[in-house]
Amino acid sequence: MTAPLTLALSKGRIFEETLPLLAAAGVQVTEDPETSRKLILPTTNPDLRVIIVRASDVPTYVEYGAADFGVAGKDVLVEHGGSGLYQPIDLNIARCRMSVAVSAGFDYASAVRQGARLRVATKYVETAREHFAAKGVHVDLIKLYGSMELAPLVGLADAIVDLVSSGGTLKANNLVEVEEIMAISSRLVVNQAALKLKRTALKPILDAFERASQNGG
C-alpha cells in the first residue's frame, strides 16, 4: 500500500488561506487545527494528509522528506536558505512585507548617515544581516522570537526587523516603518526526491494549486 502524500502547514493565516487552494484540488481537511489537538489531520482524499508544524519548521520537514510538500512564507524560506527544496509556485497568499521599524522619535536616516552602530531586534537574523551589510549599515543583531515591538520601547534595540501587514501594531506601539526590505507572500515548496518519486500523485495537486493561485483562490 502506497503511503499518503503529506502536506506541511502552519496554523493561522497560512492554513486558512491554503484551504481554498486545497478545495480547488478537490480536497477538504476534515478537522480544524484550532480546535483539534491532533497534529496529523486527515482529508477527504485518503491519499493526502496534513501535518501541523511551526511556520519556521515547514521547510525543514519538507527538506528531510517528513513532508512531501508544504506552504511557507518567503520570510521563512529566505531565512532557511531553501536547500533541498523545489519552489515551483508563488501562491500569492498571506501577503505582507518585511520592514525596518523604529520608535517614532528616532531619526533613523540621520543615524545611518552618521555611521552609528545600531542594535536591531529580529527573528530574521540572516535576512537582516544581509540587508544591512548591503547598505553598509553597522548593526548588532539581537535574536528575539516574538513581541518585537517591545524592544525599542524598553531600550533593548534601536530598531526592529519584522513582518508588517496593516501597520496597526506598529502604530499602536508608537513605532514607524522606515524601510521595506522585501515583499512577502507564501510559496509552495516540494521535496526534490518526492517530486521525482511521487510525481504522478503530486502533479494534479500542484497543478490545481497553481491554477487557483493565478485565479485568486
From Swiss-Prot:
Similarity-based family: Belongs to the ATP phosphoribosyltransferase family. Short subfamily.
Record note on domains: Lacks the C-terminal regulatory region which is replaced by HisZ.
Main location group: cytoplasm
PROSITE patterns attached to this UniProt entry: ATP_P_PHORIBOSYLTR
Any one Gene Ontology BP term: L-histidine biosynthetic process
Catalysed transformations (reactions): 1-(5-phospho-beta-D-ribosyl)-ATP + diphosphate = 5-phospho-alpha-D-ribose 1-diphosphate + ATP
One Pfam assignment: HisG
Record-linked InterPro entries: ATP_PRibTrfase_cat, ATP_PRibTrfase_CS, ATP_PRibTrfase_HisG, ATP_PRibTrfase_HisG_short
Keywords: Amino-acid biosynthesis, ATP-binding, Cytoplasm, Glycosyltransferase, Histidine biosynthesis, Nucleotide-binding, Transferase
Coiled coil: none
Protein name, per record: ATP phosphoribosyltransferase
